[in-house]
């Protein structure tokens, strides 16, 4: 909470707009250790995760009561449990960003150095480059069913591209034969692009989807393949629909929690680093920033797949960019606001979770496309 109070002070006295949190996890077994503090939401939606990471806590400084702004500590019932929502126990939160927050979840000084170099390279070289005119959408049939003609991820990537003027789309889809293995994903990324949109399923180590009407087959990419990415200097902003792709509290040290070893292995929380952060901090390739979920993603199958839940959230980033918001933190925060305008987060705990867990791993002051 000291960090949040410092941000409040800086906002009121220095007029800041952007806050970059630098630091990820650095060990700890019984208790996690962090280079930069984190906040866990205690929203329990009935799934098997009663907590998840949320940096939105650091962005939402004020709540408004009778037109007056007061500090929002995310503990309105005063019981010391932040962002609580479990049955009748519920903290009333504002959740609208007052500053633009992003995180570099670096685990050592070398990662910090390389991320600074990567950001400088992007902002000083991307402008006017041919590769920046590309949009890459990677998807398939997210919820395959023989009687369902809708390929949800493919529809989402197409809808995202429709917000973009002056760009060329490369749809790497299972239905058009361009997505059959991780090599197809690597080849598409290696050509460089402004925006990279995955829409499907995920965990902290991998992202994947299905061919049409075939739920037994998975096509995707995991972190062990990231060393093959070679789009050096042609870094996209990456938007990811799927579960846990930016769950940046993962660690190989979790394998020492022997009592929960089966669950840890199954949920891939033993990954050295999360998929989203690994994509971002990849040297010589990967993304310049990644926006993805720290917890379970939630999607709507079928005809209404773009109108609710996670797919709808994915699209709000592109809507924001289409309106001229090209500073990454503002683009991200505006997308959160658009979602909450349509789905007030205090009315539904899943909508609330979707907003809280939509994490920006990157520099919030980054100018998309460079200077």
PLM region spans:
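Cysteine-dependent hydrolase recognition
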Residues: 1-371
């Amino acid at each position: 909470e000291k960090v949040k109070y410092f941000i409040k002070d800086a906002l009121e006295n220095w007029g800041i707009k952007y806050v970059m949190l630098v630091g990820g996890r650095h060990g700890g077994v019984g208790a996690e250790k962090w280079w930069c503090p984190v906040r866990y939401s205690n929203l329990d939606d009935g799934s098997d995760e009663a907590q998840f990471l949320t940096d939105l806590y650091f962005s939402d400084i004020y709540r408004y009561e009778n037109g007056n702004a007061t500090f929002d500590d995310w503990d309105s019932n005063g019981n010391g449990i932040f962002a609580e929502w479990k049955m009748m126990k519920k903290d009333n939160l504002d959740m609208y960003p007052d500053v633009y927050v992003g995180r570099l979840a670096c685990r050592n000084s070398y990662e910090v150095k390389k991320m600074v170099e990567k950001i400088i390279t992007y902002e000083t070289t991307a402008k006017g480059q041919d590769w920046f005119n590309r949009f890459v959408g990677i998807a398939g049939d997210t919820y395959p069913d023989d009687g369902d003609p809708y390929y949800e991820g493919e529809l989402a990537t197409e809808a995202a591209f429709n917000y973009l003027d002056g760009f060329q789309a490369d749809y790497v889809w299972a239905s058009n034969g361009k997505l059959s293995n991780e090599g197809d994903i690597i080849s598409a990324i290696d050509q460089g692009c402004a925006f990279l949109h995955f829409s499907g399923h995920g965990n902290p180590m991998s992202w994947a989807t299905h061919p049409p009407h075939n739920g037994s087959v998975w096509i995707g990419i995991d972190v062990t393949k990231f060393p093959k990415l070679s789009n050096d200097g042609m870094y996209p902003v990456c938007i990811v629909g799927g579960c846990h792709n930016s769950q940046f509290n993962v660690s190989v040290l979790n394998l020492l929690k022997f009592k929960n070893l089966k669950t840890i292995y199954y949920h891939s929380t033993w990954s050295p680093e999360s998929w989203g952060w690994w994509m971002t901090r990849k040297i010589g390739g990967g993304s310049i920033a990644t926006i993805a979920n720290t917890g379970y993603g939630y999607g709507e199958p079928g005809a209404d797949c773009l109108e609710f839940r996670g797919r709808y959230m994915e699209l709000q980033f592109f809507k924001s960019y289409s309106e001229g918001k090209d500073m990454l933190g503002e683009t991200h925060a505006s997308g959160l606001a658009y979602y909450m305008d349509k789905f007030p987060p205090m009315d539904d705990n899943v909508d609330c979770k979707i907003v809280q867990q939509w994490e920006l791993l990157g520099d919030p002051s980054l100018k998309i496309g460079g200077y």
